[in-house]
C-alpha cells in the first residue's frame, strides 16, 4: 500500500524515497471520521544498490535505535515484551531471529493485526482490524531475509523491513483498542534487539 513515490538526492545525503501509504481508491479509512484525513507519508527510505538490487532502509537520524530489553522469551505463553516500548503507539524495533517455527509480532492487545514471520514467509493479516482492506497477504521470502527484521509502527501505519532492506512491506493498520506496546510470540530465538520510541 504505497503510492506516489518520489525520490530526492543530494550530494551531502543519501538518495531518499518518500511515498504515500494507502491507495487512491481507499478513501473510506477510519481517520476520515476521527480527523478528517486519509493516507499518510511513509518513513523516508535511504536507497542503495546491492548486487544490482535496490535496498531500502529507514532514514530516521532523529530516531536512533538503542539496545532494548526483552521481558520473557518468545516461547513463553505471553511471549517476550519489549520493555522500552510499553505503552507506546509509535515506535521503531529491530532484531535478529532464527526460526524453529512461526514468530508472531503482536502490536497491542487484541488489536486485530497479525504479523507472522517464518524462515521463508511473511504473513500480514488485517481482517481483524478496523480497516480490513487488503485482507490477508502472504509474501514468499528469500533464504535469510527473515533473519534481520526492522519494524516501524506509527499508530495507523506499519512498515516491515526484512533482509536489511531487501524487502519492504507497508500497510495502513487501524488497530482495535489502544494498540500500544509490542511483544514477540512463537518458536524463534530473538537476539540483538534494539528499539526507539517516537511518542
Regions found by a protein language model. Name each.
Residues 1-199:
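Beta-rich accessory regions
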Amino acid at each position: 500500500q504505497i503510492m506516489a513515490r518520489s525520490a530526492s538526492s543530494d550530494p551531502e545525503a543519501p538518495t531518499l524515497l518518500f511515498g504515500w501509504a494507502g491507495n487512491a481508491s481507499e478513501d473510506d479509512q477510519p481517520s476520515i471520521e476521527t480527523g478528517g484525513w486519509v493516507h499518510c507519508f511513509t518513513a523516508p527510505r535511504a536507497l542503495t544498490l546491492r548486487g544490482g538490487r535496490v535496498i531500502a532502509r529507514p532514514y530516521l537520524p532523529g530516531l536512533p535505535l538503542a539496545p532494548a530489553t526483552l521481558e520473557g522469551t518468545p516461547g513463553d505463553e505471553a511471549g517476550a515484551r519489549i520493555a522500552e516500548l510499553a505503552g507506546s503507539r509509535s515506535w521503531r524495533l529491530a532484531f535478529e531471529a532464527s526460526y524453529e517455527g512461526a514468530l508472531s509480532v503482536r502490536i497491542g492487545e487484541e488489536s486485530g493485526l497479525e504479523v507472522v514471520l517464518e524462515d521463508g514467509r511473511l504473513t500480514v493479516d488485517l481482517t481483524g482490524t478496523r480497516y480490513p482492506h487488503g485482507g490477508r497477504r502472504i509474501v514468499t521470502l528469500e533464504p535469510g531475509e527473515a533473519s534481520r527484521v526492522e519494524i516501524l509502527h506509527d499508530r495507523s501505519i506499519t512498515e516491515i523491513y526484512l533482509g536489511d532492506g531487501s524487502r519492504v512491506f507497508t500497510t495502513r493498520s487501524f488497530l482495535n483498542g489502544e494498540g500500544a506496546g509490542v511483544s514477540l510470540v512463537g518458536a524463534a530465538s530473538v537476539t540483538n534487539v534494539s528499539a526507539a520510541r517516537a511518542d
